[in-house]
């Protein structure tokens, strides 16, 4: 019997593949407005500081393909086909939807490689995909909206923190900062759950790791006139040091799932500059990347959505 094909649409932010692509990438982020030469060179300088280019593109592809393999192993009566759709670089989200249509995919599941729901992130990604799929007559996309409290995601970070604490002598003088990408403050007034979800993630991980000294912070805010959510992790580090005299700072950028510019530069460079100034120790646990434990986490999340499709098919077949 021929296996039914299911599209697995994996969406992420995207990153330039080379320094030559940085300007086009930055221009796309700015909705078609080219950045100033000063802003462009600043961004290029950041990429150079982490080795020339971000590893994100390679990691994202690996995550998507390993997740697809895992789904095919779990649901042997179906054939999952992987489609990668990116927000700011090719292949764009629309490219992936059009490819699914050409391949004859009738049903698809979408997952964004970001755990916390926001109108700026997960909602925007899924709306782009579903809008085009409806315009071109398919496929039907079943979106996954959030997974910030997925037990396997919580366990991953709890284990990483426990491992990090084995390297710290005075654990009472250590603090964990859970962070995510800052967004414009106006989302809070609009009722966006983004901030609450980060706090919930932090609370769950802290409980699982049995830590008391922790807080949430925000990083990588955009350079726009609008105020962005704070406190920024660098300012927060200084404030925590002044108030509690912590000697070790553990940065857990749980809003991200891979090593990329925001982690390798904003955390590993900028935050470390601050801890060095304070004569404090800097720690940043391993990111999930394409580790098997994280792929298993993603597969569990997608499986839940897949079971909805399977159950619906069973109901239809029995009627």
Swiss-Prot record:
Recorded GO CC terms: cytoplasm
Subcellular location: Cytoplasm
Cysteine disulfide partners in this protein: none
Binding-site positions, Fe(2+): 181, 262
Reactions catalysed: Fe-coproporphyrin III + 2 H(+) = coproporphyrin III + Fe(2+)
Primary localisation category: cytoplasm
Pathway where this protein functions: Porphyrin-containing compound metabolism; protoheme biosynthesis
GO MF: ferrochelatase activity; metal ion binding
PROSITE patterns in the cross-refs: FERROCHELATASE
Protein keywords: Cytoplasm, Heme biosynthesis, Iron, Lyase, Metal-binding, Porphyrin biosynthesis
Residues noted as binding Fe-coproporphyrin III in the record, renumbered to the chain: 13, 30, 46-47, 54, 125
One GO term of the biological process aspect: heme biosynthetic process
EC number, UniProt record: 4.99.1.9
InterPro entries: Ferrochelatase (IPR001015), Ferrochelatase_AS (IPR019772), Ferrochelatase_C (IPR033644), Ferrochelatase_N (IPR033659)
Recorded family membership: Belongs to the ferrochelatase family.
Its job: Involved in coproporphyrin-dependent heme b biosynthesis. Catalyzes the insertion of ferrous iron into coproporphyrin III to form Fe-coproporphyrin III.
Official protein name in the record: Coproporphyrin III ferrochelatase 2
Species annotation: Bacillus anthracis
Organism ancestry: Bacteria, Bacillati, Bacillota, Bacilli, Bacillales
């Amino acid at each position: 019997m021929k296996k039914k094909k299911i599209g697995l649409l994996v969406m992420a932010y995207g990153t330039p593949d080379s320094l030559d692509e940085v300007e086009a990438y930055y221009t796309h982020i700015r909705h078609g407005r080219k950045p100033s030469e000063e802003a462009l060179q600043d961004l290029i300088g950041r990429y150079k500081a982490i080795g020339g280019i971000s590893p994100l593109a390679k990691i994202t592809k690996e995550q998507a393909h390993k997740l697809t393999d895992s789904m095919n192993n779990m649901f042997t009566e179906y054939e999952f086909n992987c489609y990668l759709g990116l927000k700011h670089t090719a292949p764009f989200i629309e490219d992936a939807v059009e490819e699914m249509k050409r391949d004859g995919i009738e049903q698809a599941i979408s997952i964004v490689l970001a755990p916390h729901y926001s109108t700026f992130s997960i909602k925007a990604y899924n709306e782009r995909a579903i809008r085009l799929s409806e315009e071109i007559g398919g496929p039907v996309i079943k979106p996954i909206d959030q997974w910030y409290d997925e037990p396997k995601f919580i366990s991953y970070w709890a284990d990483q923190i426990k491992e990090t604490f084995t390297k710290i002598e005075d654990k009472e003088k250590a603090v964990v900062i859970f962070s995510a990408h800052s967004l414009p403050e106006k989302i809070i007034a609009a009722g966006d759950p983004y901030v609450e979800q980060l706090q919930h993630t932090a609370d769950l991980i802290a409980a699982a790791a049995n830590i008391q000294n922790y807080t949430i912070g925000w990083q990588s805010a955009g350079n726009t006139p609008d105020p962005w959510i704070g406190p920024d992790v660098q300012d927060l580090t200084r404030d925590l040091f002044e108030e509690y005299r912590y000697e070790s700072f553990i940065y857990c950028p749980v809003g991200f799932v891979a090593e990329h510019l925001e982690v390798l530069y904003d955390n590993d460079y900028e935050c470390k500059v601050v801890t060095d100034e304070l004569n404090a120790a800097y720690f940043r646990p391993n990111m999930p990347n394409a580790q098997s434990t994280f792929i298993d986490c993603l597969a569990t999340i997608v499986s839940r959505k897949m079971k909805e499709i399977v159950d619906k098919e069973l109901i239809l077949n029995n009627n």
